[in-house]
Each structure stands twice: as structure tokens, then as C-alpha cells.
């Protein structure tokens, strides 16, 4: 079963949050939380809180779930409305200040986590190009 967590109108830019998502996607929740605990970015605190909230949601919705089996199925960040402010500039003009917001969505799953596919190593032999026909 899937459990969805949404953090809306977060006062951190979308790109700042998106930098940390590869450390969370596809990981077990305990491993994702420990990954985020070592990161200095403010968005890591918010992501960690969101994952813990997802664990609490999963336990509340189905009482017999083991939190160790939960893993992050998907995690993405969307653009939210921008707060527009004005800063006074020279000669009576104004410069815009754009305070960007974001929405975070995390989906946790207790289904069996798929195995990562192993890439096949290329053979040491290099194929030769076919010779051009003689005229």
C-alpha cells in the first residue's frame, strides 16, 4: 500500500529542495533519514520531517505495519506561487523581490522494493567496422 505525504507552500526554492531528492528516492526510510541527517541544507530538515510524518501516517492507517519495511517510492518537488515584494531603488523606482515557494510530495510504500538491475559489462572485444567494397 502507498502512503502519501505533502508539504505545501514551503518557503524554500524548488531547486534547493530538488538537489537532495536523489539521496531519498528508492531508499528505505531509515536509510533516507540518516542520509538527510548528515546534510547541512535547510531543506534536509524539512524532508526528514516529511518522511517521519509519512511513517506516522502509515502506522496510523494500518496498525500492523512494520516501519522498517517502508521505502520511498517517489519523491518530487513542484513549483508553488511566488510571493512578490518590492525593494525601493534609486530615482523613485522599485526593484522586484521574488520569494519562491515549493510543494513537496513523497510517496512511501510497504510493497516489496524492486531490485536494482545490474548493468552488463561490455565485452573486451571491439567490433571492427565492415570493410568498404573495392571498386
UniProtKB/Swiss-Prot annotation:
GO terms for molecular function: rRNA binding; structural constituent of ribosome. Transmembrane segments: none annotated. Keywords: Ribonucleoprotein, Ribosomal protein, RNA-binding, rRNA-binding. Residues 124-135 have a biased composition (Basic and acidic residues). Pfam families: Ribosomal_L22. GO terms for cellular component: cytosolic large ribosomal subunit. GO terms for biological process: translation. Residues 112-135 are annotated as: Disordered. Part of the 50S ribosomal subunit. Belongs to the universal ribosomal protein uL22 family. This protein binds specifically to 23S rRNA; its binding is stimulated by other ribosomal proteins, e.g. L4, L17, and L20. It is important during the early stages of 50S assembly. It makes multiple contacts with different domains of the 23S rRNA in the assembled 50S subunit and ribosome. This is Large ribosomal subunit protein uL22. It comes from Brachyspira hyodysenteriae (strain ATCC 49526 / WA1).
